[in-house]
Amino acid sequence: MGHQESPLTRAAAGGAAYIKRLRKVLSWRELGDGHGNLEAEASPGSVAVITRAAPRRATRSARLPASRPTRLCRQARLGTDHPPARAPRGNRFARKRNSAGQITIQGPAPPHLGARRRDEARGARAAPLLLPPPPAAMETGKENGARRGTKSPERKRRSPVQRVLCEKLRPAAQAMDPAGAEVPGEAFLARRRPDGGGGDVPARPRYSLLAEIGRGSYGVVYEAVAGRSGARVAVKKIRCDAPENVELALAEFWALTSLKRRHQNIVQFEECVLQRNGLAQRMSHGNKNSQLYLRLVETSLKGERILGYAEEPCYLWFVMEYCEGGDLNQYVLSRRPDPATNKSFMLQLTSAIAFLHKNHIVHRDLKPDNILITERSGTPILKVADFGLSKVCAGLAPRGKEGNQDNKNVNVNKYWLSSACGSDFYMAPEVWEGHYTAKADIFALGIIIWAMIERITFIDSETKKELLGTYIKQGTEIVPVGEALLENPKMELHIPQKRRTSMSEGVKQLLKDMLAANPQDRPDAFELETRMDQVTCAA
């Protein structure tokens, strides 16, 4: 994929000519796919796939198996499950599940994922993340007793790593920055002088890591403190030796930096820093004058490692807003049901999705794990996060028309995407087939709101963690709603699922519309925002 050249050809061509050709490739790819996140026109023959595992992403592709493997056993909960589907189970397109609840659908197989590396944890001090101010020459640019009742069904999924104490994190930063390995506490980072003069200047630590708050194959997230202001921030560390990591990082980078205005329900992105050989450089998206940025894009396009080796590790660091309240799962399931809180969360989520769609962004992985909570203002505020699978639709075009990167009249509900990606319990029927639009976000939001109001959950069989998620019961198994609707589009959803749930008629009808099997029957984000303001949660 992309522009292929052998190392010998590259050396012969010379650095300047090579970068010039790479820029041409980048310009061509930018117009169609947004830096390695190619969205081809949907076709029944081949569907690219990115599969997800809670709480963070793992990307894999696999060829279509010859026969459908046996479904994982999922223990059903008596008394609170959805009634069995009325239609027989008919032929289902072939797919495969693994023990983490991931799905693979037909598509080309990319290079094998880089093995996840868990940093050693020793030491007795908080580790400084050494990011100096960039030179001018660099680019800038519980409540207890909350839930009682029957046991939730089990579903194999991954769960977040438990919070690690700050005393154990110093080696993690040392692995990131060799200079930090020898200088504890008041460490320095060598960088070149802005005026181009020789020698090194000391750099005050920009951020100090406090605790690890999340880990996945995509990266590690730390709680950190800004050295100058003392503000708490979240810092995501992504190792650049795996092309899949770089591709997901660039997708998130593009989505968050394309937002020209802030929204209180979207996690705020502060800056991106590329660290290599002990030197840090701020990155700006789309800067074709940055050789390092072009090499990142080349890594994503070619699917081969360009930056980052064992002897000289290379990392991307995303600095973002810190949310101290955990995710939506933790917040909702640790408190008693409250119609006022439910209504507030519904309004906040619809406002966030409308804002994203207005800015031509399809999230594609909405789920409670990716919705964070902050209570700094005294009331819970939701923050939609984790944009690694998101798609910026500016520059795409309807069939038969040329793309226009500057087109401000993009309608995300008319742009067809083809990568079957997301988390299975929240995937719309059309996503399973690999032919969908932004209406898939509306379906995922419907699943989240339904599960939040009724406290419908399943249990991770490995970690025993309870997760919000709506499902359909088929015999002794539980099936994601989108998958069941794909088998039987005429299946009637019983909302509310529990007889004792108090739910207004307005919410019932709104949820049915959001979960319609046909995406054309669902409201778009702007209509949903208007309707959501007019309904009440309790009957």
Swiss-Prot record:
A Gene Ontology molecular function term of the record: protein serine/threonine kinase activity
Biased composition (Basic residues): 148-160
Keyword entries, A-Z: ATP-binding, Cytoplasm, Kinase, Nucleotide-binding, Nucleus, Phosphoprotein, Serine/threonine-protein kinase, Transferase
Compartments it resides in: Nucleus; Nucleus, Nucleolus; Cytoplasm
Entry keyword annotation includes Transferase: yes
Pfam families listed in its UniProt record: Pkinase (PF00069)
Active site: D365
Enzyme Commission no: 2.7.11.1
Catalytic activity as recorded in UniProt: L-seryl-[protein] + ATP = O-phospho-L-seryl-[protein] + ADP + H(+); L-threonyl-[protein] + ATP = O-phospho-L-threonyl-[protein] + ADP + H(+)
Positions that bind ATP: I213, G214, R215, G216, S217, Y218, G219, V220, V221, K236
Domain Protein kinase: 207-535
Subunit structure: Interacts with PDLIM1/CLP-36.
Family classification: Belongs to the protein kinase superfamily. Ser/Thr protein kinase family.
Protein name as annotated: Serine/threonine-protein kinase 35
Name of encoding gene: Stk35
